[in-house]
Design a protein with these regions (language model features):
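NAD(P)+-binding Rossmann beta1-loop-alpha1 motif at the extreme N-terminus of oxidoreductases
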Residues: 1-57
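Rossmann-like NAD(P)-binding element
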Residues: 49-71
């Protein structure tokens, strides 16, 4: 199962960290390139995290997509 996150702020970072350090089974997490510093940090921290080229790639390649953007 591939998980995707559109939005890479503090909330997405916390949720992704929680998923990656839990026993939840997933293939990879594809994240938005919007916040480059947070995205790069998550990719370095967790080997299953991949930075997408754009948000459409997240929608196309993920089974579940989480919207973590400011309303």
């Amino acid at each position: 199962m591939n998980l995707g996150f559109i939005g890479t702020g503090k909330i997405a970072s916390s949720v992704i960290t929680g998923i990656c350090t839990s026993k939840i089974s997933f293939n990879k997490i594809i994240i938005s390139p919007r916040n480059k510093s947070i995205a790069k940090n998550l990719k370095q921290k967790f080997k299953k995290v991949i930075i997408a080229k754009n948000n459409q790639q997240i929608v196309d390649k993920c089974d579940w997509v989480f919207l973590s953007v400011t309303p």
